[in-house]
Amino acid sequence: MDRLGLLCRNIYENNKMTQRELAAAMDISLGTCNHLVKEGLDQELFSFDPVDGSYSLLKGGVDLLRNYRMDSAVILAAGFGSRFVPLTFETPKGLLEVYGERMIERQIKQLHEAGVPDITIVVGYLKETFEYMIDKFGVKLLYNPEYHNKNTLTTLYHARECFIGRNTYLLSSDNWMRNNMYHTYECGAWYSSVYMKGETSEWCLETSKKGLLTGVKVGGEDSWVMYGPVFFSKEFSEKFFPVLEEYYHTPGTEQMYWEQVLADLLNGEVDSHLPGKHHFPVPGMYVNRQPDNQVYEFENLEELRLFDERYRNHSDNIARELISQVLQVPESEITGIKCLKTGMTNKSFLFKVHGKSYICRIPGPGTELLINRKQEKAVNDSVKT
């Protein structure tokens, strides 16, 4: 992470910050900040006016920031979102609303506010539902033909050209950020992180004193974990994507998250998936620590219902409304929803009401063309007798 570049960025965004405020914004000590300010003044990156307490970027600072200007963003939106059924039977997870605003739209607006207009959405499941965004937000859509049976490692492989030679954010369509954490300039690759107290099954980070990622392990306790957006610098992508491509072409990696490639590089375990290959350089990536209540990754419908009360009793979902009517209970009492494997002609899920388990089956289009329901009933009746 170029700390002088980061200092110049903060001055660019707010030229009247105190050194204490600068230190907090950069997640460094006040003493380190004092040293950096002196270094920046000596190198004529910026000047300081003691009368009004303001900084001014000089040509050197402007030139330094030019190398770190953001080029683009890629938003992952190809998956089904099985833990959000029945909502995702009708709507991709990223198009679900939180407090009346679609999660993916909120992120696009935040990116635009930061001066990042070039946005690509990687689509798959219900891809046509994202087409309105081409005109509304000027985004590009990239189709992932393997979305239905492979994981995010494959998604990044298909989107790899969006990263090469560019400074690019990587976002998940179903994340929700309270405050805008994107910038016009980024001074080093990073992964957003939140602190998890107690035991967690998240991907836990090991870092150096300066915040450089040195290791990743799945599960731990009282740890900073991978959570939210990621920034891929040009330099990071140049080293990372050749390894990811090797993984993609290796059998047995189909269900991997892309983060597994990064974890293997940091942990020195690439040869566990690519036998005999140890020559890959480790790309530098830093932790970007976020405060509590800033980044949200909703793991399931229950978490979303706790966060946005609208989903407790009025989800605007046909299946939940029907269950509510048939069983004569408010939607808030429909719990324990779990997706069942989708059949040829229908979609099904388990749920509970007052501790009793039920199955809801939603007939799909073409059901009556494939199945004669009268004949099916006659067969069932004959079996019973």
Task: Show which residues each predicted segment covers.
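Conserved alpha/beta core of the MobA/IspD/sugar-nucleotide pyrophosphorylase nucleotidyltransferase superfamily
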Residues: 12-15, 58-73, 225-322
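Conserved beta-loop-beta/alpha segment of the NTase-like Rossmann-fold superfamily
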Residues: 128-203
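Short amphipathic alpha-helical interface segments
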Residues: 1-25
